[in-house]
Amino acid sequence: MTGETEADLSGAEPSRNRRRPKAPIMEIDGRRLKPATLMMGHGYDPTLSEGSLKPPIFLTSTFAFDSAAAGKRHFEGVTGIRPGGAEGLVYSRFNGPNQEICEDRLSVWEEAEDALLFSSGMSAIATTLLALVQPGDVIVHSAPLYAATESLIGRILGKFGVQWLDFPAGATEKEIGAVIEKAKGLGRVALLYLESPANPTNVLVDLEAVVAQRDSLFAGEDLVPPIAIDNTFLGPLWHKPIAHGADLVIYSLTKYAGGHSDLVAGGVLGSNALINAIRLMRNTIGTILDPHSAWMLLRSLETLELRMSRAGENAAKVCAWLKEQPQVEKVVYLGFPETARQADIYRRHCTGAGSTFSLYLKGGEAEAFAFLDALKIAKLAVSLGGTETLASHPAAMTHLSVPAERKKALAISDNMVRISIGCEDADDLIADFAQALRQIG
């Protein structure tokens, strides 16, 4: 839209609608600032908040307009008449200062054009799917997915005529292409949805292969399905999917980004065009994150690199010890690729192995439960990415609703324990796992 057209829409000039923060400092003497530095102040100007070093928490449901024309202009953005969302603050279902500052900082990690905050990881996923998928469309996804995501696609969207096909997380480019080609025969392929590494098996998806097959099979077509990837297990430190061709990156920000097991949040990062479509859906159904949780996320992002680095170092030491124990069948950890193909995917995509892994014990559910019940430092709880170490039993907990035959096909077995290593002392964690393993022989 031209400047003249925009002025004609509302009769208000853009420059008068809102006090703007100072221009962000992204580089000094030609040196581009790192995300860890930008997390301390990017997107926030203290002079707009009485000099407060940290952003206040804006606990308000609505915002006053400078003029009626300014209000009209803001609503043109909120309703999609003007691309890019509201230029000013309107109503807390649409936007707010805490959310906008946090969204700006999230974008920094992957050099994304834009980002959105949501009330949970699942609300981020659901809002994205509702924005991009229509009745009769087809979704192609990697498998396994987080159980709630599988339920959303198969059980809920399925009721509205949405079909899906999947391929195993470790599939080759040829296998991925065959599934996409089959999906094209069923209807409009609206979305390629990935989760890497897969939850809870820790198998990596070859994102670059998915991009190559998508670009080849849809070359010259008007409608090219975007690729969305759930990067919760590795991002934003150890894997940056946008750099490898993903269009959207989805997070449960509850995990590493929040990092203290004291908030629930989700996020989506990507191009302006796709984020605009998702923003309109978020505005409609009200899945935005609340101001207090957004403020807590800002706090957490300041220490994200420190926490993830420490947890990753701990996990490497703990996994090296675990794999040598007689009670352990195997440890599925990205630092120990099981196949040459997984090693190749890891080399091309990842900068670190993460701190969440799958531990397969010798035995079954009884042995897994005995191990979990004996833990003294690690907490028996679902989730991951917090400062504390967590352990859970996917088959009986997060993936309980998955049919038995599908769990078997996806290697979600009764002897599997999922562990997320935290920031404790690594040797203390090893001592805890050692005494717990003794409970099963």
Task: Cite the ranges covered by each PLM segment.
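PLP-dependent enzyme catalytic core of the Aspartate aminotransferase-like
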Residues: 2-22, 113, 154, 163-165, ...
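Conserved C-terminal alpha-helix-loop-beta "cap" of PLP-dependent enzymes
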Residues: 23, 330-417, 421, 429
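Glycine-rich beta-alpha junction loops
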Residues: 44-46, 59-66, 233-235, 255, ...
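Conserved PLP-enzyme active-site core in the AAT-like
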Residues: 8-30, 39-48, 114-327, 332
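Acidic-histidine catalytic/liganding microenvironments
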Residues: 109, 322-326, 375
